[in-house]
């Protein structure tokens, strides 16, 4: 695996002389802060399943929830604690005896206790003095330690607290027995330079491990978490997919892969499982992962641009920072209007179709033309679209062998109009026109074609499949025609159902007539 701190001269120089730890501990709070995402409510069974998967992923600490919040929460946390997972199980508790007692009763390994320290919270929420807040924090920590449980202490809204007072609070917390102190950027107001400064100042005074909990209100949660690590923070709070209140929290997958691939910092995470757990959490929370989400989004390793796709096919690192397999993803060449011939040829090969072997150059050119035409209509071309186009192109007779060609078609339909179709066919250099009515536009068009060529060829079966979703889906029409003692099945694909139907019928007619000639 490439480590940019070693390979990239700019990064290497920028990180010189920094106090970056060799190993960072991952504290996952998906089941607590992640569940506080508006609209998310996990059942105890879902929380247990996610906890098992988080443990399998390799997180060091699982914050299983806020025990005092509900009986269901307590039930889930107790069950998680009984599973004997490798991860340390943590419960959140305000610096209040009632909260702490409920957390202790759940059997957690660690209690994450907190009290707000910023001027805003002191004045408007707590209505307490600086000294009173320190006393409350110390009492809570000492009470937890009396029960032999590890303590993580957070000064809520730390990043809007006066720095001298913040240092005093944390020092008193450590003196009371806190095993680790956590610095929450509660409303995400930090910038990386400021976060580095704050953690660096705390490291001078605090002799226990320092953790950070960054919110993403300005889109800086991951950047601030990494800045904290640059200053020496040993633990980072994260959530899967960056879930959390308001703008969310630092995304675990982004933090971990940045630490490993850019900084060369070790974590215990099995990165190949990142995509899998991202999908699981998305399923249970019913919050879709945005396609362009780093690391786990569907487009994270997808390429459409001809230049990019060609580069990736030549050497993956030209347009990818890490191999997709490293996070459980797969590289995707997305076909559309920007796609070049190299990418389309590679996609065909992926689908088991080789140019020069399974299709000729003319057929390949037609396939490219049709794929780009779909892309021009704003459509994302799927593998099934490609297969349908290939089947349609390959299944058609060469132009020189075709007896019937469609010159023109016009269809009229409506709620007060009888469906009517008019066609002009070129049959052995002669133009024949006909019109017909039907129970629908497709029926009218097929009847008009049959009328133009005579009654010797009949439509026996007609099937239509929507290959992809949406009102502009590519439709595949399959028809079975009978004529001259022969039965032929053909297919055609188009976004226009009438057009696909007409092309399938005409292709079938040509095949019957070609066999008749032979």
Swiss-Prot record:
Its cofactor is a divalent metal cation. Keywords: Amino-acid biosynthesis, Branched-chain amino acid biosynthesis, Leucine biosynthesis, Metal-binding, Transferase. GO terms for molecular function: 2-isopropylmalate synthase activity; metal ion binding. The keyword Membrane does not apply. PROSITE patterns: AIPM_HOMOCIT_SYNTH_1, AIPM_HOMOCIT_SYNTH_2, PYR_CT. Homodimer. This is 2-isopropylmalate synthase. It comes from Methanocaldococcus jannaschii (strain ATCC 43067 / DSM 2661 / JAL-1 / JCM 10045 / NBRC 100440) (Methanococcus jannaschii).
